[in-house]
Amino acid sequence: MTNADPHELQKFSDLAHRWWDPNAEFKPLHDLNPVRLGWIDAHAHLAGKRALDIGCGGGILSESMAGLGAQVKGIDLSTEALGVADLHSLESGISVDYEAIAAEAIAAREPGTYDVVTCMEMLEHVPSPGDVVAACATLVKPGGWVFFSTLNRNLKSYLFAVIGAEYIAQMLPKGTHDYARFIRPSELAGFVRATDLHIVEIKGITYHPIGKRFALSNDTDINYLVACRRGA
């Protein structure tokens, strides 16, 4: 059984044609991308590395990593989003290999294959996030890096990420997030501890409304990033 929620898949498939419009529904991802890309590259030094982007959607992060010299494969279960990703790759001239396959399925097929595995803004959209974390641990080479980003579960994150971002500021479409699926850092750390990954760094992401920009911070109350490494 695929670890996916049909409602979540349909939600993002319906918006697939908007992935690369920097002023549409995925504007927050476009604004966030330079921050997360720089953080990933600072740890993993992407040039020349083989990278897998799980839950790649329309390919915003996948293309960015390829642009830094990584050999990138992007996977997603939304064929509509992957169609947009393929088309944009042709238009940009940045080569990325896209495939419609679940993380668990590719982990069974390609264990220990990738230097870098990214799973960004995806765990909070699947029924069993721990299974995805385990798949990431299987996919990465010994000594390789795995990166996660997700949303903390607390009153502050509900007020800012759901009420504020979706209903007041309308930065995201209503219904983008299901608060019950937000993941506390301690819960994600538990998933990681069940694998042979170890956590290297946890960073928060803060949004500055005046400058309309995201920045790394030590505040993990809302959005946060986790860098993990597999034992050599």
Swiss-Prot record:
InterPro entries: SAM-dependent_MTases_sf, UbiG_MeTrfase. The keyword Signal does not apply. Keywords: Methyltransferase, S-adenosyl-L-methionine, Transferase, Ubiquinone biosynthesis. Belongs to the methyltransferase superfamily. UbiG/COQ3 family. O-methyltransferase that catalyzes the 2 O-methylation steps in the ubiquinone biosynthetic pathway. It catalyses: a 3-demethylubiquinol + S-adenosyl-L-methionine = a ubiquinol + S-adenosyl-L-homocysteine + H(+); a 3-(all-trans-polyprenyl)benzene-1,2-diol + S-adenosyl-L-methionine = a 2-methoxy-6-(all-trans-polyprenyl)phenol + S-adenosyl-L-homocysteine + H(+). It holds the Pfam family Methyltransf_23. CDD domains: AdoMet_MTases. This is Ubiquinone biosynthesis O-methyltransferase. The gene is ubiG. Its EC number is 2.1.1.222, 2.1.1.64. The keyword S-adenosyl-L-methionine applies. Pathway: Cofactor biosynthesis; ubiquinone biosynthesis. It is an enzyme of class 2 (transferase). One of its GO terms (molecular function) is polyprenyldihydroxybenzoate methyltransferase activity. S-adenosyl-L-methionine binds at residues 36, 55, 76, 120. GO terms for biological process: methylation.
